[in-house]
A protein has these predicted regions:
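Short S/T/G/P-rich N-terminal loop/turn motif that feeds into the first structured element of a domain
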Residues: 1-53, 62-69, 88-105
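Conserved short beta-strand edge segments in small beta-sheet-based binding/regulatory domains
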Residues: 78-89
Length: 105
């Protein structure tokens, strides 16, 4: 599965408040935990900067379909601007660069 960094920005304070009302409810009733880990998707971390109206997530997904399924409802309901970047782990950096360095000799 591929790692993705999601940078999410609320468009305004009104939508941020509405989204957090839903998030608090979903967190407390277990919906977030259920949707954060499936066979093809896993939320590894989610951090909040509410003063900036921003949430940053690191997730692992089988494909862009799982990214869409997880994040699209939040975007559709609250107009959250989302940017997704495929990223790699430290071990991947080491492995990939070892291969690269072999070709540069």
């Amino acid at each position: 599965m591929q790692l993705f960094l999601a940078d999410c920005q609320f468009p305004d304070i009104e939508n941020q408040v509405k989204a957090y009302q839903l998030f608090v409810e979903a967190w407390e009733n277990g919906e977030i935990a259920k949707s954060d880990k499936t066979d093809k998707f896993e939320m590894l971390f989610r951090v909040h900067a509410p003063g900036e109206g921003r949430v940053v997530c690191l997730c692992r997904a089988h494909s862009d379909k799982e990214i869409f399924e997880h994040f699209a409802p939040w975007r559709a309901k609250f107009g959250i601007h989302m940017e997704f970047t495929p990223v790699i782990s430290c071990q991947n950096v080491v492995d990939y660069h070892k291969d690269l360095f072999k070709t540069l000799k």
